[in-house]
Structure formats: structure tokens, C-alpha cells
């Protein structure tokens, strides 16, 4: 359900089309879009704030995604109604996203679990303030290898979360390093936001019990004045 909260303006339908695109793209449970003023005819906004809950990116659920963009250029508004929305650039983009441990585990299971050679099963990762730990089984030839992992985490290329200097233990001492390296490569990156259609770059990760938060160097602040659009699933 969409709700437009503002005074009556002729371009409300255009911005509703914009929100509709992100709702269809991300399948959020809730969404809030706030704009400082109307877009110009080229699709440029002065200031945009977006707050999404329960976003799905490539089958990975993000518990939250918050973005503040200034001087942001979209394609022409007349194209938005057809679901053609492109965000090409912005003068400033601040963002933060929190991903829950259970959603990372589900995403990895969907991507890597199986019974064949080179596949994982029963892998469970745990996130704590000091880092990540976990264990699972990796199929290599006729072997079913138990692998234990302890690792820090790092942001890579502005949109990915990777293991950082992982320490690995296996239940068979004669397993060569290339096997464990291959096993780890199957679950990397843990989080991949490259398909996120926004020009954002994340720089840091903060870990809490059961969650990881990726953020830009500065956190986005809410846009308190402007035209507000909301969506609830």
C-alpha cells in the first residue's frame, strides 16, 4: 500500500512511480521516500532520503537500507512509469545497511549447499563484535571435510563483505591449502550488493551479536522537511 503525505502537487504521480520501481525491485516490507522538492525535467533531485526495511537483493535479505543522496541524477521522469529507472550519479551519497546473521546463512545455503563435489552442507556462521566464526562440511572427492572458520570481516569494492584473514581448521591434517582456499571461495563474498541500482560506496563494517552493518564514512541523516511517500507491504 502506498501513501503520499504532502500537499497537492502535480508531480506526485512521477515520484510515486519512482518509489514503485524500488518497491518492485527490492520487495521491501516497508519503505519511506522523502524528497526536498520536485525533480527537474531531466530527473535530477536536489535531495533524496530513502529508508527501506526487509530489502531483498539477489535473494539476500537486508534488514535495513538507508540512503541519503544529494544532487542525484535519474533518467527522465516520463520513463519511470514503465519501470525504467536509472540512477546514474550523485554529488553525495551516504548509506548504511544492516544484514542479520540468519539472512547471511540462508543466502549462503541457497548459493552453495548441495551433495556434489565442491559444495557445502550444514554450514553455520555466527557474527559477534570481535568477528565471525562458524563451521560446516565441504565435499571434496570422496571426503566430507569439516571446516571451522574464525575471521575478521572487511568491505571490498564498496559493495561486498568478505572474510578478512580467515583462520581455518580442518578435521584431516593432510588436506592441502588449495582445497580449503577453494572451499572459502565458494562462500565469498558473504554479502554482495553490486546489483543495488544506486551509486553508493560503503567503506566500513560494524559487527554486533547476530548482525553486520555496512556504512559509508559518514552516516546518512534523515531528511526532515520535504515531500514524504510511504509504503507498507
Predicted regions, residues:
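Extracellular/lumenal and peripheral-membrane lipid-interaction modules
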Residues: 10-233
Amino acid at each position: 500500500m502506498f501513501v503520499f503525505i504532502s500537499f497537492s502537487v502535480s508531480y506526485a504521480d512521477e515520484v510515486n512511480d519512482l518509489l514503485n520501481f524500488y518497491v518492485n525491485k527490492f520487495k521491501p516490507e516497508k519503505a519511506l521516500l522523502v524528497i526536498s522538492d520536485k525533480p527537474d525535467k531531466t530527473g535530477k533531485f536536489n535531495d533524496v532520503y530513502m529508508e527501506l526495511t526487509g530489502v531483498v537483493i539477489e535473494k539476500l535479505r537486508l534488514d535495513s537500507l538507508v540512503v541519503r543522496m544529494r544532487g542525484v541524477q535519474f533518467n527522465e521522469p516520463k520513463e519511470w512509469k514503465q519501470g525504467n529507472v536509472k540512477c546514474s550519479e550523485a554529488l553525495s551519497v551516504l548509506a548504511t545497511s544492516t544484514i542479520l546473521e540468519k539472512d547471511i546463512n540462508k543466502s549462503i545455503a541457497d548459493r552453495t549447499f548441495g551433495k556434489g563435489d565442491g559444495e557445502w552442507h550444514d554450514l553455520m556462521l555466527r557474527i559477534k563484535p570481535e568477528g565471525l566464526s562458524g563451521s560446516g562440511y565441504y565435499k571434496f572427492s570422496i571426503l566430507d571435510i569439516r571446516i571451522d572458520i574464525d575471521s575478521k570481516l572487511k568491505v571490498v569494492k564498496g559493495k561486498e563483505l568478505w572474510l578478512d584473514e580467515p583462520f581455518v581448521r580442518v578435521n584431516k591434517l593432510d588436506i592441502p591449502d588449495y582445497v580449503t582456499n577453494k572451499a572459502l571461495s565458494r562462500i565469498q563474498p558473504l554479502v554482495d550488493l553490486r546489483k543495488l541500482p544506486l551509486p553508493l560506496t560503503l567503506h566500513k563494517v560494524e559487527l554486533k551479536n547476530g548482525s553486520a552493518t555496512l556504512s559509508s564514512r559518514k552516516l546518512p541523516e534523515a531528511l526532515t522537511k520535504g515531500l514524504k511517500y510511504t509504503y507498507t507491504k
